Regions:
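Extracellular glycan-binding segments that recognize GlcNAc-based cell-wall polysaccharides
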Residues: 2-13, 17-217
Length: 217
């Protein structure tokens, strides 16, 4: 899981370059997931950050990739009731922090600590990971027009979402989690949906309902 989130955040930072243009690969690795995320953030210039807790699931981090790209922010990792020292070091010049998840994921104590540092805080969290991903999409839409969304299964499709996270970040495109059968939104005209995963992950009915292009191996 530490390797997975490190890879995901690396992709979010790097975007999606042409594979033929890659002449070398830089290894970024910390002693744990918190330091790895901080080392990646060191490669960026930013005034905003996105904070997620990946102790139990990667879902919030994957949903946040489009928002991170939209506001030009690194994804940093938090514990529920405290900010790890490696994460705290990366907050020095931050003006705004987006907390992903309810207080069950990242508690009020973390929010208060950020505010004490003079950082504006916006929390985006729903009743579950599906609603949270939809609320993140709404936040992106309030900042910029959306012309594409990725939909995947929020419980069995994390690997599929990970494969699209770099593109979602590059394009500021939401990754919306579903139960594989329904979506928490009405598809708008001019928005292209991409369904991530096979029929076992995303049903054919959902693909038809959203007029989505299925991306599956």
């Amino acid at each position: 899981r530490v390797l997975s989130i490190g890879l995901t955040i690396s992709l979010i930072m790097a975007g999606a370059p042409n594979i033929n243009a890659l002449s070398s690969i830089e290894k970024i690795q910390g002693k744990d997931r918190y330091e790895t995320a901080a080392k990646i953030a060191q490669k960026q210039t930013y005034e905003n950050v996105v904070l997620v807790n990946t102790d139990n699931t990667l879902a919030d981090g994957l949903s946040a990739s489009g928002l991170a790209g939209t506001v030009k922010a690194p994804i940093l990792l938090s514990q529920r009731n405290s900010i790890p020292s490696d994460t705290e070091k990366m907050l020095k010049d931050v003006k705004k922090a987006y907390i992903i998840g309810t207080e069950d994921s990242i508690g009020k104590s973390v929010e208060n600590e950020l505010k004490q540092k003079g950082i504006e805080v916006k929390r985006i969290g729903g009743n579950d990971r599906i609603e949270t991903s939809y609320l993140i999409a709404k936040e992106i839409a309030s900042i910029k027009p959306i012309d594409k969304v990725f939909i995947t299964n929020g419980y069995t499709g994390e690997a599929d979402a990970m494969s699209a996270s770099s593109v979602a970040s590059r394009d500021g495109a939401p990754i919306i989690l579903t139960n594989g059968k329904n979506v928490p939104f009405e598809k708008k005209e001019g928005v292209q949906c991409y369904a991530l995963g096979s029929e076992e992950i995303i049903s054919n009915d959902l693909v038809k309902k959203t007029n989505a292009v299925r991306l599956a191996g």
